[in-house]
């Protein structure tokens, strides 16, 4: 019998500055939203609202919304979870399977329920106190992925709950919800001495290799776009930005992208420091080709899992 969850690592050997570039890009660009926009609609349990919202915020949703990874990373889509559960003598606990899961199309604000794997029944979230017939405990809550704009249009699509209650409770808490995009990285990534390593979790109910490819494809596209948009000031060196003086041959390095790219072409630079370097050695298209080849190598390694 296949275990529902396995920890694995994907390892590739790369030129050290390129490995560092990919690792830093992953950590800065691959942002999976947390469920930080949480609203408790009803709660007679012994856990206070803040405890529920903290637990729900960190639900590992990527293993549920795996069919929509690319559009969630590009923020074309968001998602929400909804829980309405009452304690009974027979069922005295809550698992992740008790939630309903919905994908949100940000263009239309359409809300569509997604299938949930039965394996979620094995992930316990809360245990009620001892059951008493006259004081059964209940909880109802909803939580949206970070970055979701709560407006009348999207609220009108929440046909599974009492909109009046939602509006009242949302108005009570909206001022304390973090307006910034709150996220986590899908995996831990390290790159000691060019040994780029992804520490991943593989689940039995979906094709991890396909999902991992979606993530790497997104990362490659985002990195290439950033490379094309990146500028180094030419002229007198300015310590507020990366800059290069062609007359003196001095380069001031003030950002990670500049550092990694020039190091790939033989410089031994560090952040916030001056280096004598011939910038004509830098071939951006050659670096992009090396990046694309590295991404192919990463995907090839993932296929061996």
Curated annotation (Swiss-Prot):
Keywords: DNA-directed RNA polymerase, Nucleotidyltransferase, Phosphoprotein, Transcription, Transferase, Virion. It holds the Pfam family Pox_RNA_pol_35. It is an enzyme of class 2 (transferase). Its main location: virion. GO terms for biological process: viral transcription. Transmembrane segments: none annotated. It catalyses: RNA(n) + a ribonucleoside 5'-triphosphate = RNA(n+1) + diphosphate. The keyword NADP does not apply. GO terms for molecular function: DNA binding; DNA-directed RNA polymerase activity. One of its GO terms (cellular component) is DNA-directed RNA polymerase complex. Its EC number is 2.7.7.6. It is found in: Virion. InterPro entries: DNA-dir_RNA_pol_35kDa_poxviral. Part of the DNA-dependent RNA polymerase which catalyzes the transcription of viral DNA into RNA using the four ribonucleoside triphosphates as substrates. Responsible for the transcription of early, intermediate and late genes. DNA-dependent RNA polymerase associates with the early transcription factor (ETF), itself composed of D6 and A7, thereby allowing the early genes transcription. Late transcription, and probably also intermediate transcription, require newly synthesized RNA polymerase. Belongs to the poxviridae DNA-directed RNA polymerase 35 kDa subunit family. The DNA-dependent RNA polymerase used for intermediate and late genes expression consists of eight subunits 147 kDa, 133 kDa, 35 kDa, 30 kDa, 22 kDa, 19 kDa, 18 kDa and 7 kDa totalling more than 500 kDa in mass. The same holoenzyme, with the addition of the transcription-specificity factor RAP94, is used for early gene expression. This is DNA-directed RNA polymerase 35 kDa subunit. It comes from Vaccinia virus (strain Copenhagen). The gene is OPG156.
